[in-house]
Amino acid sequence: MTIDLKTIKHISKLSRISVDDAKANKLAGDLNSIFDFIEKLNELNTDNIEPLTSVAETTLKLRADEVKSENIRDQILKNSPEENEDFFVVPRVVE
């Protein structure tokens, strides 16, 4: 895939970014280098390679989920400077 100035101008118009000709030439060269590298990666045979999900082979210890039926509403409301009918009362910020 080759990126030319016409494509750069089209992309810049779609993205609403102004690009002058000097920057467009440099950008076209940079994008062509990136696409050339991607093409080299596509040539690699990865059929017998297992997908890598993590560099380090680690597993996390999982804990068992426990359902707790504690009613901590009163403990939480104790931390509030002001409460009314089981709700926090906060100062008005918008008039």
Swiss-Prot record:
Q: What is this protein called?
A: Aspartyl/glutamyl-tRNA(Asn/Gln) amidotransferase subunit C
Q: What does this protein do?
A: Allows the formation of correctly charged Asn-tRNA(Asn) or Gln-tRNA(Gln) through the transamidation of misacylated Asp-tRNA(Asn) or Glu-tRNA(Gln) in organisms which lack either or both of asparaginyl-tRNA or glutaminyl-tRNA synthetases. The reaction takes place in the presence of glutamine and ATP through an activated phospho-Asp-tRNA(Asn) or phospho-Glu-tRNA(Gln).
Q: Which EC number(s) does the record attach to this protein?
A: 6.3.5.-
tRNA processing found in the keyword field: no
Whether rRNA processing counts among this entry's keywords is: no
Q: State the reactions this protein catalyses.
A: L-glutamyl-tRNA(Gln) + L-glutamine + ATP + H2O = L-glutaminyl-tRNA(Gln) + L-glutamate + ADP + phosphate + H(+); L-aspartyl-tRNA(Asn) + L-glutamine + ATP + H2O = L-asparaginyl-tRNA(Asn) + L-glutamate + ADP + phosphate + 2 H(+)
Question: Which top class of enzyme applies to this chain?
Answer: ligase
InterPro entries of this UniProt entry?
Asp/Glu-ADT_sf_sub_c, GatC
What gene name does this entry carry? gatC
Q: State the similarity comment.
A: Belongs to the GatC family.
Its Gene Ontology molecular function terms?
asparaginyl-tRNA synthase (glutamine-hydrolyzing) activity; ATP binding; glutaminyl-tRNA synthase (glutamine-hydrolyzing) activity
Q: Which keywords does this chain's UniProt record carry?
A: ATP-binding, Ligase, Nucleotide-binding, Protein biosynthesis
Q: How does it assemble?
A: Heterotrimer of A, B and C subunits.
Q: Which GO terms describe its biological process?
A: glutaminyl-tRNAGln biosynthesis via transamidation; regulation of translational fidelity; translation
